[in-house]
């Protein structure tokens, strides 16, 4: 899946935008997706610091990973 498909899927599933940013940057307390130096990265941003950064060679892999991470958070909150 690409970034647009991911965004559409999260909107369709009514996932709160408070959980994530698909535009990178350093928003506070969000999972983030970004494209840096030719690779895709997923990280958690808190207080201007990127933590738990994971790099992927493809957009598809990064989008699947962040979707799974967001889904785990949502399911965890429901339980």
Regions found by a protein language model. Give the residues of each.
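A short, polar/proline- and glycine-enriched secondary-structure boundary/capping micro-motif
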Residues: 52-56
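Structured catalytic/translocation cores of nucleotide/phosphate-coupled proteins
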Residues: 1-5, 27, 33, 41, ...
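Intrinsically disordered, low-complexity charged/polar segments
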Residues: 20, 72-79
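Negatively charged, low-complexity tracts enriched in Asp/Glu with abundant Ser/Thr
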Residues: 1-25
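Intrinsically disordered, low-complexity segments enriched in small/polar residues
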Residues: 18, 41-42, 63-65
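A short, charged, amphipathic alpha-helix used as a generic interaction element across diverse proteins
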Residues: 57-73
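Short aromatic-glycine-(Arg/Gly/Cys) micro-motifs in beta-strand/loop hairpins
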Residues: 24-51, 69
């Amino acid at each position: 899946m690409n970034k647009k498909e991911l965004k559409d899927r999260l909107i369709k599933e009514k996932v709160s935008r408070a959980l994530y940013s698909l535009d990178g940057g350093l928003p506070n307390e969000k999972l983030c997706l970004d494209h840096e130096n030719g690779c895709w990265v997923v990280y958690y941003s808190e207080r201007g610091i990127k933590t738990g950064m994971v790099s992927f060679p493809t957009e598809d892999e990064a989008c699947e990973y962040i979707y799974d991470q967001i889904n785990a958070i949502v399911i965890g909150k429901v339980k």
